[in-house]
Amino acid sequence: MNSGFTHITVLLEEAVEALEVRADGCYLDGTFGRGGHSRLILSQLGPDGRLLGFDKDPQAIATGQALAAEDGRFVIVQRSFAELGSEAQERGLAGKVSGILLDLGVSSPQLDDPERGFSFMNDGPLDMRMDPTRGVSAAEFIATAPAEEIARVFKEYGEERFAKRMANAVVARREVQPFERTADLAEVLKVANPAWEKGKNPATRAFQGLRIHVNNELGDLEAGLEAALDALEVGGRLVVISFHSLEDRIVKLFMRKLAKGEADNMPRNLPIQFKPFEPKIKIHGKAQFASDTETKANPRSRSAVMRVAEKLR
């Protein structure tokens, strides 16, 4: 399926290089998207290598199925990467995966297609679901949630300073007419925001908060990181690309905690040696960002942060 909207894969070479792909390895692409990372991984796998892709988006699944028809080493499943643990168990891969890649957030085709309802830039139905067949849409949430809950979503997930004021404006307006279109909601948020940031649409943060809530993005990330650690073999690599501070904070803290071991809250110099207190992962290098060349070619890569870890036990 060709949606007509293109996607430029961020940190393509860097992410796949960080995986240290082995020709006979088994790899998981937790966020297939349009397959940029997956295709490069496949190009480095030998005949015995395997790649399993995950995505919730129906258009991504269609693209993945076409790739699977061309290459028998690749399989794609329509599941969140939060469920990669159970998928690995079902396929007998638990503790046997050589590397896992998570490229977080929303893809360019999702943002650019007005019918998906992710963007305030182009009017479309107020949906925002990565899988439009499951869960509650943004319109349904906005129509039923109390002002306090809407404000929490704007503030907690969108880091919006004027969350309460904007939520009250949304509730006041929905009592007159329900929200069905992205442009309609964006206009109400724009009017309710008293301090516009230079170069940024005043609805940006609220829309981010809604999208994260509707898709349970942070909850999925936390579950996916834990599942990834269990699925990896010793020496396996976990590569995560995030696009905003909330995601990156979760990834950074997860990796730091496991790299230090689990004895952070225990008294020092205890006369015991206990395996669970030893580090579970090794962090490789510092956070990596897109190059100047990449950010000029693809401005959406400016906020990308990549972190890499290796499983020790």
UniProtKB/Swiss-Prot annotation:
Its main location: cytoplasm. The keyword Methyltransferase applies. The keyword Ribonucleoprotein does not apply. SUPFAM superfamilies: Putative methyltransferase TM0872, insert domain, S-adenosyl-L-methionine-dependent methyltransferases. One of its GO terms (biological process) is rRNA base methylation. Its EC number is 2.1.1.199. Keywords: Cytoplasm, Methyltransferase, rRNA processing, S-adenosyl-L-methionine, Transferase. Coiled coil: none annotated. Gene3D superfamilies: Putative methyltransferase TM0872, insert domain (1.10.150.170), Vaccinia Virus protein VP39 (3.40.50.150). Disulfide bonds: none annotated. It catalyses: cytidine(1402) in 16S rRNA + S-adenosyl-L-methionine = N(4)-methylcytidine(1402) in 16S rRNA + S-adenosyl-L-homocysteine + H(+). One of its GO terms (molecular function) is rRNA (cytosine-N4-)-methyltransferase activity. GO terms for cellular component: cytoplasm. It is found in: Cytoplasm. S-adenosyl-L-methionine binds at residues 35-37, 55, 81, 103, 110. Specifically methylates the N4 position of cytidine in position 1402 (C1402) of 16S rRNA. Belongs to the methyltransferase superfamily. RsmH family. This is Ribosomal RNA small subunit methyltransferase H. The lineage of its organism: Bacteria, Pseudomonadati, Pseudomonadota, Gammaproteobacteria, Pseudomonadales. The gene is rsmH.
